Amino acid sequence: MKRILFGLLLLTSLVSKAQINVTFYGEPDELKELKTRLLLVEILEENEDVLEKLSKPKKAEELKDYKKFIVDFNADFKVYAQKYWTFTDKMEFKTATEIKDLQKAKNKSYAVLRLIQLNDKGYWGVRTNQNVPALAFTRIESSVAKADSKIYLPSRNLNNDKSLSEADYKYALSILQANVDWIIANNKVLNFDKYAEKMAKENVSKLKGKTLLVEDNMLMKGRSKEQAIKNYGGDLKFVSENELSDALVSKAKNTAVVYTAPYGIVKSNAPFVSVSTIVYFKIIVDCETNEILWLYMPGAMNWGANMSNQITEGEFKVMADLKII
């Protein structure tokens, strides 16, 4: 099952500041209590405003895609939430409207797992309509904008694939729960960015000796696979999306996979110019343990860093040197 439409943009080249809210609003004791609640998995509904915007004949294909997205996402989310959510097996599936009704009744006995959009907050430059998709695990009484915990969703648009695979759900749900468990165990809140960096630094030595799988289309056009393999200096294989996904789902031993996901919006700071774009990080995950082994998440001040959803030969040298960016 692979389906999800997000419509993210490819990177052009810019320098600027992060534009989305990455804060976790749940404190350790609140997250500990949250794990014990009955889980509501939010089912999407068609949005009347979106339907109206797409009602014109020239938008017919977009309307069709939007309606299909709702149906397909809900079907997949039901399956994979039940398969990969381990905090509880007590869950119900409710629409956003039903969850809002429970909120209005001030019912605080539920946790919610939902798809959210991290919108451009306009911290810098002109606010845009760009956003970063994420999954949130949060208290029902919390607002959508102030989720207790969240994780960015992987990007699969390199293949013009309007979808997430089972492996993508496994990656997101497993690491989101691991992030929450770390916060509880250490009595300290780390958002995903900081948590992933910490785990990568602690685990990067485990990357040595593993077979590393990279999706064929992730290598930037015009770049050399031979040079990438030479730079890595280990067992590096370029494979299809299905092969990579199968390895993660089947918990392939001594194998790791490279993922990419959007994590922010950057804007130009040039006078009289307003340009913004989505930026991406790369992450390596152990197929058997779901541990984060490596992270490449450049900040705005990392001049010349590759923030696209593709990878160059240079990043493989960074992997080989066990460096975290």
State each model region's role:
Residues 98-172, 299, 313-325:
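Extreme N-terminal leader/targeting regions
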Residues 19-59, 63, 218-325:
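Hydrophilic extracytoplasmic domains
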Residues 1-27:
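Bacterial Sec-dependent N-terminal signal peptides
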Residues 129-248:
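Acidic, serine/threonine- and glycine-rich low-complexity intrinsically disordered segments
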Residues 19-132:
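Start-of-domain marker
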Residues 38-41, 90-94, 108-116, 124-127, ...:
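Ordered hydrophobic segments in well-structured contexts
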